[in-house]
Amino acid sequence: MPRRREVPKRDVLPDPKFGSVELTKFMNVLMIDGKKSVAERIVYGALEQIEKKTGKAAIEVFNEAIANSKPIVEVKSRRVGGANYQVPVEVRPSRRLALAMRWVRDAARKRGEKSMDLRLAGELIDASEGRGGALKKREEVHRMAEANKAFSHFRF
């Protein structure tokens, strides 16, 4: 634990186009080397593609995709008597959002489309409809937690 005072959390401003704090957070997750304008261009381009492809409001598809990707439980390693156990723990809300955004970003980067905005649009549409790489990752994490349910009494 640091001995200095606790650093206050910075407030994230909502994005100018949609007024969504989650969208700004996602841009920050997507950003590489501090190039926020590039991240903004990718996200807004992807949202335009989503509106073209689905005909639904892009921000709704985005919110649905993130909500579907949020994990409920995950496993953490805990050492007990010389053995490491994968202990299932509930994920706190702020971490749920962060993990979901990270998984959507990583799944989009692995896709085969030509540009990042097309990849991101495809992944967001897939995640909102209950499929895609981000949901595969979530299911994998849930499976791990389910498999190690027996160790849940080793809580943190």
From Swiss-Prot:
Superkingdom field: Bacteria
Keyword Ribonucleoprotein carried by entry: yes
GO CC terms in record: small ribosomal subunit
SUPFAM superfamilies: Ribosomal protein S7 (SSF47973)
GO biological process, one term: translation
GO molecular function, one term: tRNA binding
Keyword annotations of the record: Ribonucleoprotein, Ribosomal protein, RNA-binding, rRNA-binding, tRNA-binding
Function: One of the primary rRNA binding proteins, it binds directly to 16S rRNA where it nucleates assembly of the head domain of the 30S subunit. Is located at the subunit interface close to the decoding center, probably blocks exit of the E-site tRNA.
Entry similarity comment: Belongs to the universal ribosomal protein uS7 family.
Quaternary structure and partners: Part of the 30S ribosomal subunit. Contacts proteins S9 and S11.
NCBIfam families: rpsG_bact (TIGR01029)
UniProt name for this protein: Small ribosomal subunit protein uS7
